[in-house]
A protein has these predicted regions:
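Catalytic and substrate-binding clefts that recognize carbohydrates or anionic sugar/phosphate headgroups
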Residues: 1-120
Length: 120
């Protein structure tokens, strides 16, 4: 088995009030738009209860779109798309007090593309 670790940490925003956290990472059954700190697996499977809470063990999703976004300034967002064919766990850390975003990706394979989209 091959593991790929990718860790990205955004610098804190100027004010914590503009920080909302990371959103995205697949088709989510959660009522929350922004992800809580926790683990979020991406692996297509037909599950009877896809509701997620970010607690271990992570729940698999019905459909996967490994794209996430976070706000890094008042009117600026960063989007990241991971084009991977392997099962992947995303470890999310949203620090609402400091306005810092942390995400770590652990994939079971080593080949893929990563696209970063920046807004002005």
């Amino acid at each position: 088995m091959n593991w790929v670790n990718l860790e990205a940490n955004a610098q804190p925003t100027k004010t914590a009030e503009v920080f909302k956290g990371i959103m995205g990472l697949g088709e989510r059954a959660s009522k929350e738009m922004f992800l809580k700190s926790g683990v979020y697996p991406i692996w297509n499977t037909d599950v009877d209860n896809p509701s997620e809470d970010g607690l271990l063990p992570g729940k698999q999703t019905y459909g996967s779109h490994p794209f996430y976004m976070f706000k890094h300034a008042k009117n600026s967002w960063i989007g990241v798309y991971h084009n991977l064919a392997q099962a992947t766990d995303y470890w999310v850390n949203n620090d609402f007090a400091s306005g810092k975003v942390g995400i770590q990706q652990v994939a079971t394979g080593g080949y893929g593309d990563i696209y970063v989209i920046l807004s002005a």
